[in-house]
Amino acid sequence: MKSISQCLGNVSLWIEQQTHDMFYWVGLKIADYPKWTLFITTIWALLMAGGVVRFKEVNNVRDHFSATNSPSRYEYRVAREFFQELGSPFHVVVAMQAADGGSLLRPKYIDKALEIEDFLQYKLKGSFGNQSYSYSDFCGTQCETSDAVSIFLSMFRDQQIKKTAHVKLTYPSMDVFGHRVYLANNIFQVKINNRSSIIEESKLVAINFHAIYNNETMYEIMKEWEQKLFAYTLSTENDPLIRVYVTSEGLVSEEVRRTGILAMPLMGVTFLIILAFTILTTLKRDPVKSKPFEAFLGVICPILSLCASFGHLFWMGFEYLPIVTVVPFLILSIGVDDVFIFIHAWHRTPYKHSVRDRMAETLADAGPSISITSLTNLLSFAIGIFTPTPAIYTFCVFISTAVIYDYIYQIFFFSAVLVLSGEREEQRKNAYLWWKDVPLPEEPTGKQKKETIVSRVLGKVLDFWVDFIMAKWSKFLIGAIMITYWIFMARGVMEIAVGLSSEKLFLDDSPLLPLVRLQTNVIFKEGGQVAVFVNNPGNMSEPDAVPEIMRILRRFEVANNSVGAASTHMWLLPYLPYVGEQEHGSIEFKYRYLPEFFKLTEFRRWSHFVNLGNHQDCLSEKPSCLQKFVFSTGFHDAVSWSDRLALLENWREMASEYQHLNLTIYEDFSMYSDQLLTIVPVTQSTVFCALICMIMILTLFTPSPVTIVTSTAAVLSINLGVFGCLVYMNIDLDPISMTTLLMAIGFSVDFVAHITWHYYKGDFHSKRARIRHALAGIAWPMFQAGTSTMLAITVLALVHAYMVQVFVKVVVLVIFLGMFHGLVVLPIVFSALPFTKTSGPQKKKVAPLQMHEAGPIPKKEEPKVIKVNGEEDEEDEKTTKEEPVEKSVRSAERA
């Protein structure tokens, strides 16, 4: 075990030395050509930004939020292919509800409802070109699908007025002159007579407007009519009688897009807030060392990386999704974090060194730290690229590319800015009025004395902080807090709900929300339809063919939560009696009557349930006449997604028993139910892979067993808190929250890696000195970074939408937990555990000419072992060992 630890330590030392030397060399090169570096990086960003000419926004909830390997996606494709010969489907749902919440079957409400239905069918028109079109103009063979409501309301009104009883308006289906009309898909919140099942009240009525389009012109006509319908429903908001609601796949996509559009202008507000914060927290009293302009360019740096990364992806043909809207906010916060670390490292370099040396030393100091955090962020997001959900894939591609560009621009663009800033410092130019010279002070001034007092106060605060960390009672206090925290978070993880509903994609004031909530609370409970596609019917003339189909139908009619035969739509039920009429009593299946049957007005609606081949094949009684067909039956009392998934799996299992018929089931909302199949295992595997990658990085850069175990435990603890808090913040596990969890993993490692790296690399024999050195070196930049990130993200709290609020809540949470673990928990744990580090010789500053011209770095000495508070110490005892400690602390305080 000791040899493995020693080997890891040697590997880490070699990586540390090579990384240090590489960044030192890069710093020298940038210092040699700062203006060329700025020019090249800026031009590249502008060239890539030209990719906006290929910008294409897409937004389809079904396509982008369902996994590519989910059963529902295949089932949807089968359904689309079935209707493809007719054209592409267009579907809008309109619901009517009494303004006072009462029954719609009261006389004046029925009149109003019929008036609305007639208006929507014939009088509401959308314009295209020089013509206007109503629904009746483009519905074609689908017009009858919206007739059930008008038939029911008209007959109910006539029955109330004339007191006739020749038609019984029963529920869930009624018989109209020999034709059964199923009402449970249109009439909801029904009160019936317990004896006769006759409908007495109904508080909600839904009308389904179906149509088929075959070309882009027809699609545009329907979309225009849909927008007119949407505008009309908004106008009924204050109607004294009836409130009208509408939803459709197209309107849902538009609402999701509206969320993104509303968030984008806030990017400007975020930029100004971050700019002000960055400038104010990097100002110094010394007008030469202060860096307001550099801070401004530091905030511009992530903007350039966004232009370059987004443009690059647009050039490559990637499409933009609304969920990508939050990427600029995240990259701005990540990029500004690196600016604080860079400026902090610059101020720690000796002022008397040349600009060239200072840049090399700055990059050698800050480069590895920034590399670790950038690598962890990149890996946590890049792993999401392999998830099967397109929305997560697209989000992760955009943010991963942006992280790479941000890292490159921080290393090159901002380093070049610091070089020019250093040249200004050398020339003693004013940071605010850079054309003015600032004379050297001849003697200490009052302000400088005051600055020394401030430094002393900060030093005392740091000492108090370290005293708290080193105290025994603090370990018991934090231990009790952490145990309580883990218990509550573990409980939250066990209770987290899974699933995405369409209402989570809307703004809180979306006009679609009322109907979506009615669907969830009322329609899902009272009615739904499952369609069964028979893709390979075979020879229906065989004696066992039709009986087998009817047995399958019966199995679905009596399955769990099924309504029964009253809800069934099966074309064979009217067709077989028709064949009997033609055959004078025999009802054996015949193909030759199919074309004639579907042309008859009373049976025309059944033509949508079959795919016929060549008509001549039908006349010749060939099985190729009937290529496919579909039937459907109703179900109810399936409100939760877990209940609906149980039904789906039961139906799929039944369908799988008939491989020779190639049965496929389809239900409109199966994409949401199927997320329970994929989101949990995908989240588990993705998070597991991300955590393994984080642990490998921490092991590579800080190979001490103490730092490996503690930092890994800290990352796990932070993420346990993030996962556990989801249930307390009313957030479910869905594709949206999954992307934020990937982000949380990367962010959590940032805080842990910074403090662990500074603790590990410190060459001190005292735990107190090592912890003090780590906190003095990174606490303030960590605070700046965390605060700036929260400022960047909390602006989005103005957007009242679940899709955006999830990011805000999780980012604020992970920053709070990360800072608490990084600045309090880990230092206390470090103070309680022994620490052993394989250490090479103290790094010697290499002269620029040696690094740049003389070739390789001088050979390192043999590694030594430093044991903090141990019994042995293989390094020579130094009587002046506290001197470097105090020197480091004073340097950190000056920064």
UniProtKB/Swiss-Prot annotation:
<keyword id="KW-1133">Transmembrane helix</keyword>
<dbReference type="GO" id="GO:0016324">
    <property type="term" value="C:apical plasma membrane"/>
</dbReference>
<keyword id="KW-0472">Membrane</keyword>
<feature type="transmembrane region" description="Helical">
    <location>
        <begin position="735"/>
        <end position="755"/>
    </location>
</feature>
<dbReference type="Pfam" id="PF02460">
    <property type="entry name" value="Patched"/>
</dbReference>
<feature type="glycosylation site" description="N-linked (GlcNAc...) asparagine">
    <location>
        <position position="215"/>
    </location>
</feature>
<keyword id="KW-0812">Transmembrane</keyword>
<feature type="glycosylation site" description="N-linked (GlcNAc...) asparagine">
    <location>
        <position position="539"/>
    </location>
</feature>
<feature type="transmembrane region" description="Helical">
    <location>
        <begin position="709"/>
        <end position="729"/>
    </location>
</feature>
<feature type="glycosylation site" description="N-linked (GlcNAc...) asparagine">
    <location>
        <position position="560"/>
    </location>
</feature>
<feature type="glycosylation site" description="N-linked (GlcNAc...) asparagine">
    <location>
        <position position="10"/>
    </location>
</feature>
<dbReference type="InterPro" id="IPR000731">
    <property type="entry name" value="SSD"/>
</dbReference>
<dbReference type="GO" id="GO:0005886">
    <property type="term" value="C:plasma membrane"/>
</dbReference>
<feature type="compositionally biased region" description="Basic and acidic residues">
    <location>
        <begin position="878"/>
        <end position="895"/>
    </location>
</feature>
<dbReference type="GO" id="GO:0006897">
    <property type="term" value="P:endocytosis"/>
</dbReference>
<keyword id="KW-1003">Cell membrane</keyword>
<feature type="transmembrane region" description="Helical">
    <location>
        <begin position="788"/>
        <end position="808"/>
    </location>
</feature>
<comment type="function">
    <text>Transporter, which promotes the endocytosis-mediated degradation of hedgehog-related proteins such as grl-7 in order to establish the capacity of progenitor cells to maintain quiescence in arrested L1 stage larvae.</text>
</comment>
<feature type="transmembrane region" description="Helical">
    <location>
        <begin position="688"/>
        <end position="708"/>
    </location>
</feature>
<feature type="region of interest" description="Disordered">
    <location>
        <begin position="838"/>
        <end position="895"/>
    </location>
</feature>
<feature type="transmembrane region" description="Helical">
    <location>
        <begin position="810"/>
        <end position="830"/>
    </location>
</feature>
<feature type="glycosylation site" description="N-linked (GlcNAc...) asparagine">
    <location>
        <position position="662"/>
    </location>
</feature>
<keyword id="KW-0325">Glycoprotein</keyword>
<comment type="similarity">
    <text>Belongs to the patched family.</text>
</comment>
<feature type="transmembrane region" description="Helical">
    <location>
        <begin position="402"/>
        <end position="422"/>
    </location>
</feature>
<feature type="glycosylation site" description="N-linked (GlcNAc...) asparagine">
    <location>
        <position position="130"/>
    </location>
</feature>
<feature type="transmembrane region" description="Helical">
    <location>
        <begin position="260"/>
        <end position="280"/>
    </location>
</feature>
<feature type="transmembrane region" description="Helical">
    <location>
        <begin position="296"/>
        <end position="316"/>
    </location>
</feature>
<protein>
    <recommendedName>
        <fullName>Patched-related protein 18</fullName>
    </recommendedName>
</protein>
<feature type="transmembrane region" description="Helical">
    <location>
        <begin position="323"/>
        <end position="343"/>
    </location>
</feature>
<dbReference type="InterPro" id="IPR003392">
    <property type="entry name" value="PTHD_SSD"/>
</dbReference>
<dbReference type="GO" id="GO:0030659">
    <property type="term" value="C:cytoplasmic vesicle membrane"/>
</dbReference>
<feature type="transmembrane region" description="Helical">
    <location>
        <begin position="366"/>
        <end position="388"/>
    </location>
</feature>
<feature type="transmembrane region" description="Helical">
    <location>
        <begin position="476"/>
        <end position="496"/>
    </location>
</feature>
<dbReference type="GO" id="GO:0090597">
    <property type="term" value="P:nematode male tail mating organ morphogenesis"/>
</dbReference>
<dbReference type="GO" id="GO:0018996">
    <property type="term" value="P:molting cycle, collagen and cuticulin-based cuticle"/>
</dbReference>
<dbReference type="InterPro" id="IPR051697">
    <property type="entry name" value="Patched_domain-protein"/>
</dbReference>
<feature type="domain" description="SSD">
    <location>
        <begin position="263"/>
        <end position="420"/>
    </location>
</feature>
<feature type="glycosylation site" description="N-linked (GlcNAc...) asparagine">
    <location>
        <position position="194"/>
    </location>
</feature>
